[in-house]
Amino acid sequence: MQRKLNQSLLLAEAYFKRKFTMPEVNYELRGIKAGVAYLQKNEIKFNRTLLQENTDEFIRQVVPHELAHLIVYQMFGRVKPHGKEWQLVMNEIFKLPADTCHQFDIKNVQGKTFEYRCACQTHFLTIRRHNKIMKENIEYLCKKCRGKLVFVDDEE
């Protein structure tokens, strides 16, 4: 992990011809995200469980992905999170695909989900979204068919 951070930082320093401060790193991120970059703090939080379950791919892709966010912020300020500046760092400097989402199995980090259906498929919503629907009458729509998601109540 530290070696990949160092290697990636050196590549960025050579490309931009300037020094970057090594970010603070912790492994306390929970949920389904693999990593999060905190731009103003120069800090990266990684998901320990996803790292342990997907070590090689995590180090190869997620570590530089999050570091790229910090480098972009320090070079260009506030820009789109996965915009052209970030893609430049990923593609040109790190020589990696500019993937915005990981493909890791999330069953061990996901938490309880609730089954919903629309006209075209089944969806599994987090407890947070389920509670918003139940308590606040929020509606969620399917991205494919634009149909309303309807709770499948197992107890009926």
Swiss-Prot record:
Record-given protein name: Protein SprT
Main subcellular location of this protein, as a coarse class: cytoplasm
Cellular location(s): Cytoplasm
Keyword Ubl conjugation included in the entry's annotation: no
Record-level Gene Ontology MF annotations: zinc ion binding
InterPro entries, sorted: SprT-like_domain, SprT_Zn_ribbon, Uncharacterised_SprT
Biological processes per GO annotation: response to stress
Gene Ontology CC terms: cytoplasm
Family note: Belongs to the SprT family.
Pfam families for the chain: SprT-like, Zn_ribbon_SprT
Keywords: Cytoplasm, Metal-binding, Zinc
Cofactor remark: Binds 1 zinc ion.
Residues at the catalytic site: E66
Location of the SprT-like domain: 11-152
Cofactor: Zn(2+)
Record bears the keyword Cytoplasm: yes
Top-level lineage group: Bacteria
Binding sites annotated in the UniProt record for Zn(2+): H65, H69
Gene: sprT
